[in-house]
Amino acid sequence: MSICEQYYPEEPTKPTVKTESIPGPESQKQLKELGEVFDTRPAYFLADYEKSLGNYITDVDGNTYLDLYAQISSIALGYNNPALIKAAQSPEMIRALVDRPALGNFPSKDLDKILKQILKSAPKGQDHVWSGLSGADANELAFKAAFIYYRAKQRGYDADFSEKENLSVMDNDAPGAPHLAVLSFKRAFHGRLFASGSTTCSKPIHKLDFPAFHWPHAEYPSYQYPLDENSDANRKEDDHCLAIVEELIKTWSIPVAALIIEPIQSEGGDNHASKYFLQKLRDITLKYNVVYIIDEVQTGVGATGKLWCHEYADIQPPVDLVTFSKKFQSAGYFFHDPKFIPNKPYRQFNTWCGEPARMIIAGAIGQEISDKKLTEQCSRVGDYLFKKLEGLQKKYPENFQNLRGKGRGTFIAWDLPTGEKRDLLLKKLKLNGCNVGGCAVHAVRLRPSLTFEEKHADIFIEALAKSVNEL
């Protein structure tokens, strides 16, 4: 019996689409009502989560879709997972939900156990965790940690603040509010808050009308595919982009205190960074005393066939901070140097300091991934799925450009000639029973849960071939 069958013996055997259009009439009706109190314009359909199960999401019209988007890559184990339901019904969860603690001042007696459970899933080389509330919050907290660390190295870790620092910071001025930058990359997505938004550079709609920090955006490598046929050209691309990074660090108008990168830019188009590129960034950050942050918000927790995508690069020495959220349901960053803990309390602080209810779920997710060997399964299924997609690429090369993600689990994407054609394909896929997402201008990205198996891949490939023929 497969892992999916163990979890979901009553999972549907295939998608069922009952309506002629999506969203269907009942979804449209209820979305109109919901629209009175919530912005429903981005909605695909109105979901019925009580009826959704495993790898299938159901809407209020009774349509059941094979879900390869999984709540924008945030559902790790499928819908209504029994292990997570068990964790949700625990006394610890009830306490966390009913009497949510202000952890900084009033930590619960079980917090040590909860955090140590999360740390079982920490990336190699990381043994501390700082909790947050969302992916954007995780990155904002990481930036704060980086700035505090950077200034502590200049001033002395145990040194007190000067009177000038205490006075100037109240006017948002230096030296108390130092002029420092975070370097990110073009096409990056790190969140929609103010600092994270300043490092985001994927679509104008994410940033318009918001004041932003004047921080540098370097070039992220754009590889030619297949990778094994373009190794020389791609190495030149890596070196070109690395030279830009180093030049920006040396010449930017204010000091670059930190660098943040996604090992695969997800929202920006599923752009991959090579092992060589990620390691060379480590060399550069060490050379210029820059904090190295890996954003694993979307790539983390198993979808690439490893628990953390950057582990493919085996970066040495380990990066300074690794941010997480999405599939872990909780959020925060991992680190290993205790000096990233501020020298005084209340510097990295808020009322909640994370959410114990979500931390409990994160610990349960990590345990299930480990016990069921779900990263190994994801790697196996991803290889199977990629070979099937290569077959479609040979048959329809125009509609499967730059197929990428080989050897990266089910974290797979490809491009269509235009955004309009991509959007039409996604629409056809829904009508043929598959919920799939796009990214960037004309890319299709696959983000199924870790319980997605070969039988699901076969269903998807059949629906995809049919949808492409209908374009």
UniProtKB/Swiss-Prot annotation:
Annotated catalysed reactions: 4-aminobutanoate + 2-oxoglutarate = succinate semialdehyde + L-glutamate
Lineage start: Eukaryota, Fungi, Dikarya, Ascomycota, Saccharomycotina
Subcellular location: Cytoplasm
Gene: UGA1
Modification N6-(pyridoxal phosphate)lysine occurs at: 326
Annotated protein name in UniProt: 4-aminobutyrate aminotransferase
Top-level EC class as recorded in UniProt: transferase
Protein family (similarity comment): Belongs to the class-III pyridoxal-phosphate-dependent aminotransferase family.
Organism of provenance: Saccharomyces cerevisiae (strain ATCC 204508 / S288c) (Baker's yeast)
Domain of life from the UniProt record: Eukaryota
Description of what induces expression: Subject to nitrogen catabolite repression. Expression is low in the presence of the preferred nitrogen sources, and up-regulated by GABA.
Primary localization class, coarse: cytoplasm
